């Protein structure tokens, strides 16, 4: 897979349930030691079943395995309240914007991956 999400520094992870695609998440490098999580998506019929949490945990594990020290993301808080709660529950904290996002209510978050 070419592009930002290609190995060795990027990843595209898929979640399946009974052979059906349930969701996805991707990682790509931002700068040395820092990755960005993108495209965390769970299909509507698989929501509230732990798929999003499983994808987030898999993305965190992959980022650590690659050697990233921090993970960043941006989201839209008014629309993605459940996702924002999940990110906060996993230790993400709000940071200043690190790139432009034209959406109103954009929220930027970061997690230290080194424990």
Regions found by a protein language model. Name each.
Residues 1-38, 43-44, 56-58, 62, ...:
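Acetyl-CoA-dependent GNAT
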Residues 50, 54, 58, 81-82:
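Alpha-helical macromolecular-interaction surfaces
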Residues 63-75:
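Conserved GNAT acetyl-CoA-binding A-motif
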Residues 87-96:
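Conserved acetyl-CoA-binding loop of GNAT-fold acetyltransferases
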């Amino acid at each position: 897979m070419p592009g930002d999400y290609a190995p060795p520094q990027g990843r595209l992870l898929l979640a399946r349930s009974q052979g059906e695609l349930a969701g996805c998440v991707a990682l790509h490098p931002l700068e040395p030691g820092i990755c960005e999580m993108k495209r965390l998506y769970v299909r509507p019929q698989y929501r509230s079943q732990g798929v999003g949490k499983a994808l987030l945990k898999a993305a965190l594990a992959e980022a650590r395995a690659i050697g990233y020290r921090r993970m960043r993301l941006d989201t839209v808080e008014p629309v993605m309240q459940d996702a924002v709660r999940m990110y906060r529950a996993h230790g993400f904290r709000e940071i200043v914007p690190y790139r432009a996002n034209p959406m109103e209510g954009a929220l930027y978050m970061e997690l230290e991956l080194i424990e």
